[in-house]
Amino acid sequence: MSRTIFCTFLQREADGQDFQLYPGELGKRIYNEISKEAWAQWQHKQTMLINEKKLSMMSPEHRKLLEQEMVQFLFEGKDVHIEGYTPPEKQ
């Protein structure tokens, strides 16, 4: 059975995560405030960031950068900027 939360990213009620996807206090906040739909949007942006900026998850600096981008995207309403990328609707 899915749980319903108020998603702070979507600003509406939506299906919550089935389990905590990220460690620590930030992970608890994501579990309680971010829906499956919003998390899927972040995963798409995260993949683009990793690929375009050639980030390595073995690097603590790169992981920290991704975490900062994640917080800005999910909780501060800032879109991820990827140089050279134009969304399809803006082309």
Swiss-Prot record:
GO terms for cellular component: cytosol. One of its GO terms (molecular function) is iron ion binding. InterPro entries: Fe_traffick_prot_YggX, Fe_traffick_prot_YggX_sf. Gene3D superfamilies: Fe(II) trafficking protein YggX. It comes from the Bacteria. GO terms for biological process: cellular response to oxidative stress. Keywords: Iron. It holds the Pfam family Iron_traffic. The keyword Iron applies. Coiled coil: none annotated. The keyword Repeat does not apply. Belongs to the Fe(2+)-trafficking protein family. PANTHER family: FE(2+)-TRAFFICKING PROTEIN-RELATED (PTHR36965:SF1). Monomer. Could be a mediator in iron transactions between iron acquisition and iron-requiring processes, such as synthesis and/or repair of Fe-S clusters in biosynthetic enzymes. This is Probable Fe(2+)-trafficking protein. It comes from Klebsiella pneumoniae (strain 342). The lineage of its organism: Bacteria, Pseudomonadati, Pseudomonadota, Gammaproteobacteria, Enterobacterales.
